[in-house]
């Protein structure tokens, strides 16, 4: 272990020596840049672009380009990047993560690689965690870029598509991680190229990269549409039922936060809902509602997992930042179950139209880099998932903060008394204090205790984060007491007020340890910026969530040896700190394993999504006749239909093929079994294909000109692809839930998901081609409707296509439930196009 640690340290030192060598080369240009006039310095941007076009690489331009930005920042902002900031900028340009402590000037560091990469003209995205930081950084640092002749855009959620397109077309675009993800999804749902807003994804520089790529890695971005609200009563009934249960009726697994009915709970459910067997297959939907109601009532906690807004909306609380996640909803019906629990209006369930995780969103960029003050603990994940190294950058000045040993109390009450007493003592002498909590509930509790003690303070949590930047900026003033939920206010520096250094600087008090060491380090890092004095002190109790779930047995044994009897007794020990860190490492390992599994599942969706989106983009951007593609779909559809009956009795096979042709290819009376008898399969395929081509030509002849034909082809394909893809996403979600249960049968659920997901994807492609074929062959095309179709294209519901086949199944040939479906899929009619008829 010692040898491994020594090797890691040596590698870091070697990397720093390389960075320092390049940084010195950047610094060697300083005098030359000082001597340039403003006009000459600004002219360097055009010079760099020309040199890049002639074949110089960005790496060759780096020393001089970085030097230009340093000098520009000095003239425009009065700020001159230090050597360590140059080193951080080099790491960012290389597509890695410089670990730079709080207050070391990460925002200024980013200007150098952002400028250099913008020279290539392919766009640079600077990603922040909220719109306040995007706007602030774009406004402040944008002055430097604009002065140097580069365009800067800000992409905000409230902007129109035209404004977003303008922002993305700038050399440098500031955006939040969620908005850039949603724009990507929306771009892959439009029907016209002019409605797209993004350019190809080139270089993303992510601020607070650990928050986005680690903490939110499992968070999917979902674009969805509403479905029927008839299920609301089921949510309410399930909620009423679980509220009748006692603790013996359900079983909770504390470490995994899962819950299920016990035998007595099952008996009560069968009695309550008048069932003979709760787990009969026809009750699958009901068990889903009950499971969600159990989770909502006994796992999800008010003011910890979610809050209820003043207007009665359930808002998710981000467990890592303490902020509410506006616009986000728990998936799979859990949000509706919580709404039923809290007695607020139940919003309609939604159907997913498109989704992507941050892991796969940001891996699509040609180059990805990020900044943070705390990433070394997650180095393995950054390397394995994102192919990014973590390079610790030295501080410009030595760290003067004093990190005190943790204090452990037997109970929550004794711990909070000690916290209040510490705050009171420090506040009396005027030392500013930042009290960090992991939950809204805890911050409210401490606030009440400070009010009782007569200590004025500010509270910063998920309920009032709109003021967070202002509150955090004042947290370093003399006498300030600030309670902050977790890392609320992250991204805003706490600067010390007058006379505070003499009082010991900012004191950070942690009210419990977080599951992640990184989050604790972030809290500590709010104090002692740029060599300022400061202190940090963590208060723990045996009743803390981390201790209760992961560390209590060992630590209790340790405390038994210490003879911890009285409630206010406090333990201060280095061994305790090691035990706590060991518990945190176990949790971090569990969380990493979970994120890895999410990625394995999502990679299946990613591969399929990339195929669909690439083909979709080809259709949208095509300025040509899509006839060859549609004809190929028609041919494959015919081939599949004929092949599906290759092993059937010949008479039955011919009858089935004729049924397929009549319903999907040609006018009903224009084909009979008689003309196909005696032909081989290949001959049948060719005969049907030639008939289909003739009808295809007839259909297109009804359109006015080539422009109308291309538009019709595009809308036809996109409408069907989008409908099938939406259904496929839901089917994959259901498959994922189903294969999760197979782990109990010793099957690898990920392998099963990959295999079945691939087969489902192939089936979807076949279904798309079948629907394109049938609609192309059977549509009634009205030229006079073309203009209206163009206007409504974005809804993917063109008015120039009306299927000749009525939705009424009486218009279909009579097919029995268990016969082969006439579409040629090979499935039984009841499991294919007859499903709606029989449901």
Swiss-Prot record:
Cofactor remark: May bind 1 zinc ion per subunit.
Basic and acidic residues bias: start-end ranges: 780-790
Major localization listed first in the record, in broad terms: membrane
GO BP field: intracellular protein transmembrane transport; protein import; protein targeting; protein transport by the Sec complex
Key word Zinc present: yes
MF-aspect GO terms: ATP binding; metal ion binding; protein-exporting ATPase activity
Binding site for Zn(2+): 821, 823, 832-833
Membrane topology reported for the UniProt record: Peripheral membrane protein
Subcellular location: Cell membrane; Cytoplasm
PROSITE patterns: SECA (PS01312), SECA_MOTOR_DEAD (PS51196)
Domain of life from the UniProt record: Bacteria
Subunit composition and interactions: Monomer and homodimer. Part of the essential Sec protein translocation apparatus which comprises SecA, SecYEG and auxiliary proteins SecDF. Other proteins may also be involved.
Its biological purpose: Part of the Sec protein translocase complex. Interacts with the SecYEG preprotein conducting channel. Has a central role in coupling the hydrolysis of ATP to the transfer of proteins into and across the cell membrane, serving as an ATP-driven molecular motor driving the stepwise translocation of polypeptide chains across the membrane.
Protein name (record): Protein translocase subunit SecA
Organism annotation: Streptococcus pyogenes serotype M28 (strain MGAS6180)
Classification lineage: Bacteria, Bacillati, Bacillota, Bacilli, Lactobacillales
């Amino acid at each position: 272990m010692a040898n491994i640690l020594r090797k890691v340290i040596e590698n870091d030192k070697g990397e720093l020596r390389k960075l320092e060598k390049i940084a010195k080369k950047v610094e060697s240009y300083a005098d030359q840049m000082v001597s340039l006039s403003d006009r000459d310095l600004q002219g360097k941007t055009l010079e760099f672009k020309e040199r890049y076009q002639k074949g110089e690489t960005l790496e060759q331009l780096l020393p001089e380009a970085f030097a230009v930005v340093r000098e520009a920042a000095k003239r425009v902002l009065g700020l001159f990047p230090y050597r360590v900031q140059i080193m951080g900028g080099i790491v960012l340009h290389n597509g890695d993560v410089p670990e730079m402590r709080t207050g070391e000037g990460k925002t200024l560091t980013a200007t150098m690689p952002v400028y250099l990469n913008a020279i290539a003209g392919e766009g640079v995205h600077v990603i922040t965690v909220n719109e306040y930081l995007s706007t602030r950084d774009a406004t402040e640092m944008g002055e430097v870029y604009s002065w140097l002749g580069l365009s800067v855009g800000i992409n905000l959620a409230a902007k129109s598509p035209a404004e977003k397109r303008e922002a993305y077309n700038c050399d440098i675009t500031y955006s939040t991680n969620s908005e850039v993800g949603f724009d990507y999804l929306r771009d892959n749902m439009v029907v016209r190229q002019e409605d797209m807003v993004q350019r190809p994804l080139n270089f993303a520089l992510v601020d607070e990269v650990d928050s986005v790529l680690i903490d939110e890695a499992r968070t999917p971005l979902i674009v969805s549409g509403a479905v029927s609200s008839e299920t609301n009563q089921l949510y309410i009934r399930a909620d009423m039922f679980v509220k009748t249960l006692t603790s013996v009726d359900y079983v909770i697994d504390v470490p995994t936060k899962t819950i299920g009915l016990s035998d007595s709970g099952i008996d009560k459910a069968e009695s309550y809902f008048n069932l003979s067997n709760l787990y009969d297959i026809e009750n699958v939907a009901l068990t889903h509602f009950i499971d969600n109601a159990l989770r909502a009532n006994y796992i999800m906690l008010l003011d910890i997992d979610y809050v209820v807004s003043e207007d009665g909306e359930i808002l998710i609380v981000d467990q890592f930042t303490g902020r509410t996640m506006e616009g986000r909803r728990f998936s799979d019906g859990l949000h509706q179950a919580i709404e039923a629990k809290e007695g607020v209006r139940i919003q309609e369930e939604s159907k997913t139209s498109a989704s992507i995780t941050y892991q796969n969103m940001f891996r699509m960029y040609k180059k990805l880099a990020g900044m943070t003050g705390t990433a070394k603990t997650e180095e393995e994940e950054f390397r394995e998932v994102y192919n990014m190294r973590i390079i610790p950058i030295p501080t410009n000045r030595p760290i003067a903060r004093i990190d005190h040993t943790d204090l452990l109390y037997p109970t929550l009450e004794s711990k909070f008394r000690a916290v209040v007493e510490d705050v009171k003592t420090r506040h009396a002498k005027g030392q500013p204090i930042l009290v960090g909590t992991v939950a809204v509930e805890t911050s409210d509790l401490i606030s009440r205790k400070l009010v009782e003690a007569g200590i004025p303070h500010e509270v910063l949590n998920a309920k009032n984060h709109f003021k967070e930047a202002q509150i955090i900026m004042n947290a370093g003033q003399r006498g300030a007491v600030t309670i902050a939920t977790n890392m609320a206010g992250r991204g805003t520096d706490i600067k010390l007020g007058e006379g505070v250094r003499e009082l010991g600087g900012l004191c950070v008090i942690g009210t419990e340890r977080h599951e992640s060491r990184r989050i604790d380090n972030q809290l500590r890092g709010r104090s002692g910026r740029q060599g300022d004095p400061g202190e940090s002190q963590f208060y723990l109790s045996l009743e803390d969530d981390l201790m209760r779930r992961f560390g209590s047995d060992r630590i209790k044994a340790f405390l038994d040896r210490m003879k911890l009897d009285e409630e206010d007794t406090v333990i201060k020990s280095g061994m305790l700190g090691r035990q706590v860190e060991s518990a945190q490492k176990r949790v971090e390992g569990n969380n990493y394993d979970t994120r890895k599994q999410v990625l394995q599942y999502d990679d299946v969706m990613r591969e399929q999504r990339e195929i669909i989106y690439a083909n979709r983009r080809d259709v949208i951007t095509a300025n040509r006749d899509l006839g060859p593609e549609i004809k190929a779909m028609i041919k494959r559809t015919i081939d599949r239909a004929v092949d599906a009956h290759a092993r059937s009795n010949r008479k039955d096979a011919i009858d089935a093929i004729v049924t397929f042709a009549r319903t999907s290819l040609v006018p009903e009376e224009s084909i009979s079994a008689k003309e196909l008898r005696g032909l081989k399969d290949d001959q049948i395929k060719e005969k049907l294909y030639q008939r289909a081509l003739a009808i295809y030509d007839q259909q297109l002849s009804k359109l006015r000109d080539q422009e109308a034909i291309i538009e019709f082809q595009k809308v036809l394909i996109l409408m069907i692809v989008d409908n099938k893809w939406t259904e496929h996403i839901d089917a994959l979600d259901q498959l994922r839930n189903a294969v999760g249960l197979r782990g109990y049968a010793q099957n690898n659920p990920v392998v099963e998901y990959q295999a079945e997901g691939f087969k489902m994807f192939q089936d979807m492609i076949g279904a798309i081609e079948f629907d394109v074929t049938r609609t192309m062959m059977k549509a009634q095309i009205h030229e006079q409707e073309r203009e209206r179709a163009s206007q409504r294209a974005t809804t993917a519901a063109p008015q120039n296509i009306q299927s000749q086949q009525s939705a009424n199944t009486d218009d279909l040939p009579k097919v029995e439930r268990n016969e082969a479906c006439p579409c040629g899929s090979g499935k039984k009619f009841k499991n294919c196009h007859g499903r709606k008829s029989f449901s």
